[in-house]
Amino acid sequence: MKIDYLTLFPEMFDVLNHSIMKRAQEKGIVELNTVNFRDYSGNKHNQVDDYPYGGGQGMVLKPEPIFNAMNAIDKTSKTRVILMCPQGKPFTQQVAESLAQEEHLVFICGHYEGYDERIREHLVTDELSIGDYVLTGGELAAITMTDAIVRLIPESIKEESHLDDSFSTGLLEYPQYTRPADYNGMKVPDVLLSGNHKHIESWRHEMRLKRTFERRPDLLEHYPLTQSDKEYLEHLKRDK
């Protein structure tokens, strides 16, 4: 996969040169490139923003730098051009899984008040948001999405490492424990020490249901509950 970032602050993406992202690049699994669209301003002052027509607060990113920078990137008809925008579709694990199947992504990371609408209308295939809040720029959102996407590409990490992640199964992840089995009187559940894999899997599934019920009950509306699941959830409701 190739990922390009249109940004005014390329140095912010240095954080992707560590850990799993670094190894994925070294293995040739993903290629990350930053493009400073100020270099494509097309004017002697390298101006990339201007006052909004009709008045209003803040500055708006001009179309020329973004269009020029996009023209300088090698693209195909399948390239997904993603606008970082608080108005966008919520970025979820399912969206990450979809984008992980693509060959080329371009993230447009804005600053200032917003984008000239012609950028949105004529260049963008997707508008995505990481939450109902506003950041000073799109870089942090793009970095967050990149981490979520790249770890899903085969060979980035061990496949089984992400299969049980929260949201990958439709439920939140079960509690995890490691040694020691007893730390200052705080003990690991006996079932995890039993060696009975059937009982362990049953416990983990119940814990997924319990955590989802307690923290994200909205997810249960779309999860295919078995009769046993429904009975367990009714038990949780009675004990609440």
UniProtKB/Swiss-Prot annotation:
Keywords: Cytoplasm, Methyltransferase, S-adenosyl-L-methionine, Transferase, tRNA processing. One of its GO terms (biological process) is tRNA N1-guanine methylation. Belongs to the RNA methyltransferase TrmD family. Specifically methylates guanosine-37 in various tRNAs. The gene is trmD. Homodimer. One of its GO terms (molecular function) is tRNA (guanine(37)-N1)-methyltransferase activity. It is found in: Cytoplasm. S-adenosyl-L-methionine binds at residues 110, 130-135. Coiled coil: none annotated. This is tRNA (guanine-N(1)-)-methyltransferase. It comes from Macrococcus caseolyticus (strain JCSC5402). InterPro entries: Alpha/beta_knot_MTases, tRNA_m1G_MeTrfase_C_sf, tRNA_m1G_MeTrfase_TrmD, tRNA_m1G_MTases_N, tRNA_MeTrfase_TRMD/TRM10.
